[in-house]
């Protein structure tokens, strides 16, 4: 799991994805890696 996802950050989805190495998704407040 990566950093928490903040809905106020418009780049959050990309940051989550990058953190997971290209396979991340924001699910509620959590950044989940596949």
Swiss-Prot record:
Alphabetical keyword list: Chloride channel impairing toxin, Disulfide bond, Ion channel impairing toxin, Knottin, Metalloenzyme inhibitor, Metalloprotease inhibitor, Protease inhibitor, Secreted, Toxin, Voltage-gated chloride channel impairing toxin
InterPro entries in the record, alphabetically? Scorpion_toxin-like_sf (IPR036574), Scorpion_toxinS_Cl_inh (IPR007958)
Molecular function GO terms recorded: chloride channel regulator activity; peptidase inhibitor activity; toxin activity
Q: Name one GO cellular component term.
A: extracellular region
Tissue specificity comment = Expressed by the venom gland.
Stated name of the protein: Chlorotoxin-like peptide MeICT
Q: Where in the cell is it found?
A: Secreted
Q: What does this protein do?
A: Toxin with unknown function in healthy organisms. Suppress growth and migration of glioma cells and decreases the mRNA expression of annexin A2 (ANXA2) and forkhead box protein M1 (FOXM1), two key molecules in the progression and invasion of glioma. May affect chloride channel. May interact with MMP2 and inhibit its catalytic activity. In vivo, is not toxic when administrated to mice at high doses.
Give the lineage. Answer: Eukaryota, Metazoa, Ecdysozoa, Arthropoda, Chelicerata
Family statement? Belongs to the short scorpion toxin superfamily. Chloride channel inhibitor family.
Q: Name the source's superkingdom.
A: Eukaryota
Quote the entry's note on domains: The presence of a 'disulfide through disulfide knot' structurally defines this protein as a knottin.
The signal peptide here is: none
Coarse class of the protein's main subcellular location: secreted
- What are the disulfide bonds? 2-19, 5-26, 16-31, 20-33
């Amino acid at each position: 799991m990566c950093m928490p996802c903040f809905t106020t950050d418009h780049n959050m989805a990309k940051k989550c994805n990058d953190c997971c190495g290209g396979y991340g998704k924001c699910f509620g407040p959590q950044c989940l890696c596949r």
